[in-house]
Amino acid sequence: MLSLSSTQIVLVRKQFGQKMSLNGKTVIVTGASRGIGAATAEEFARKGATVVLVAQDERKLSQLSKKIGSTARVHVLNIAKFKQMEKMFATTLREFGKVDIVINNAGTISPIKKLMDISIDDWNHVIDVNLKGVFYGIKLAIPSMLQNGGGTFLTLSSGAAHNPLEAWSHYCTSKAAVNMLVRCVDLEYRQLGIRSIGLSPGTVATNMQREIKKSQVNQVSKLEWSAHIDPKWPAKALLWLASYPGNEYLGKEVSLRDEALRRRIGMT
C-alpha cells in the first residue's frame, strides 16, 4: 500500500490541522437534506467550513441552510445525473475556487425486492445513485484537488458491501463496488495528495432504516429501533477521518462497529 510522503503529510497538516480547523475549506455533502448528510453538514460547518448542500428535497435543504447560516450553499439536484452534478461543481468552483472535501453520502435502497421481482429500471436506479453518483462526484472534484495540492473523499459504505442480504441485491452490489472505487482513488491519487477513505457506519436511525423496517424482509428489518445509532455519530466520525489521524485509514473502509475506532473518535 502506498503511503503519503513527508511533504504530503505536512500538506495535510496544513490543509486540515491536527486540531481540525476547517476555516476557508469548501466541503460538498451529498444527501444533505436529512440523516447522516444533514448531521455531517452541521458538524463540518461548526468547524468553519463552507458546506455545499446537495440533495433533491428543496424544502429540507432550505431549512438546513437557514440553520447553518451564511456558510451554506444549496443545490437541488439528482446526483445520478452527470450534467446536474457538473453544473453544481462549476458553480461551486466559480464562487470558492476550489473543493477541499467531498462527502459521498447520498444513497438509496428502495424498492426492497428480490431479484425476480424488482424491475430493471428500479435496480438500475439504485446503481445509478449509489455507485455512479459517487463516481461523478469523485471525477468532477479531482481536477480542482490536484490544482490545489490535494483534498479528501469520504465515502459512505455499508456492512451490506460484504454480506449478501435478501432483497438487497442492488444495494449490496452498489456498496461493494463503491468500496473498490474508494481503493482505486487511493491507488491512483494518494501520491498526489488526495485522500480516500470509506466509512461503514453500521445501522443508523434514518429514513432508510424506516423503509427497511417497513419491508419486514431479512434480519436487519427485525432490529429494534434502539439498536440504531444517532446520525450525529457517523458525522463525528467523518469529521475525524477528514483530519490528520484519518491518514492511518487511507484507501480503506473503516467500521463504526470497531470498538477501538469508536474510542479513538470519542464515541464511547
Where in this protein do the model-derived segments appear?
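C-terminal helical subdomain
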Residues: G198-L199, S215-R264
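Residue(s) in the substrate-gating loop at a strand-loop-helix junction
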Residues: S158
